[in-house]
């Protein structure tokens, strides 16, 4: 008798293509036919993966810290981020690096980035063509990349910064291809060829740039005199008084660089798409921004956008011990993940779950494991607070300076790009200049 929930009645190849091309449709279909818990089988993986959406089951999964990472994360991310990335380490190694990196994204240090984010947003907005259709997502990517380079990496060499701005989008474009991901899975199964050859070439160029920055910083010393995260990490020490090597610093830098700008850019693109499809919500938010006295509705808009358009669909674990979830007892070694979209669209948690209604977050806070756009437990996204903070600053700046209108009548469909769900057509908008309004005298955004 199987100890795992049922799986769709189609071969693993079909499930794999289905997941790579229409992930939301796959999850919704399984929920309708099977229920809250189901298994899926993907090419290249020996075992099925169990997806679940009940907050109590998610709490039980995330509260057990001994569970490991599912192999899918390593397969997808290690060729890009490197083996020492905090996203890929486990156990004490993961916790030690998390402790070193977390202070950079909280408290006074994070608030000090507000001017940098606002300046980057204003410069980016000034470059937008007026009165013609454009895809907003690439502009959001350029904006958030500028922020992460200036505020987090503190690249001091202008030429190096320019080349990183060229190479990182290339790396993202190559890694986002569903066709590439399918070839990776098939190559594991057939043991033929290296589908990542082009991606490795771009990664080597980025390595050269990052390692060059690290070498110069190490030669200069005086890490305590700078406020960027690279200097913070280079000066930090583990409990045994050891430090990160140059190669490990490279892995952490690339992790922060990619995870810290692509996900936020995508979340911003989704938020604008939703706002432009809901004029009353946009009008209320714009009025709040103009008044400048509070940001409660802005926070609610962001929370609702992240609920209805979660950027990362999965945040799983490999069980170290058995897990009891409802009628199923899942054995150790099972790969289990919350299906974040399914959790966020449960009618018992969110009445009218497919409606964009930010007011629900003014009526009360979501349950801890019923709103998980950043994952949960000891692997919750390090930069979650920074991402929400950056989104607030960017949304305020755009709404003060420009008017946007949607191009086309249909909302964007979700398309899978590596580990993210992005607007299929990049959030098509038309931009108009807004009557100049000075930024209101308000208290700084609370991080």
Name what the model sees in each region.
Residues 1-7, 69-78, 93, 109-266:
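Cytochrome P450 heme-thiolate monooxygenase catalytic core
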Residues 14-38, 208, 292-326, 347:
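Conserved cytochrome P450 K-helix E-x-x-R motif and the immediately C-terminal K′/meander segment
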Residues 221-227, 284-296, 308-328, 343, ...:
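Cytochrome P450 fold signature focused on the C-terminal beta-domain
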Residues 1-96, 111, 115-123, 158-159, ...:
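N-terminal membrane-proximal hinge/A-helix region immediately C-terminal to the signal-anchor transmembrane segment
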Residues 338-364:
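Conserved cytochrome P450 K-helix/beta-meander segment immediately N-terminal to the heme-binding cysteine loop
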Residues 31-32, 121, 169-170, 290-293, ...:
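Cytochrome P450 proximal C-terminal region
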Residues 263-288, 385-400:
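Cytochrome P450 catalytic-core helices
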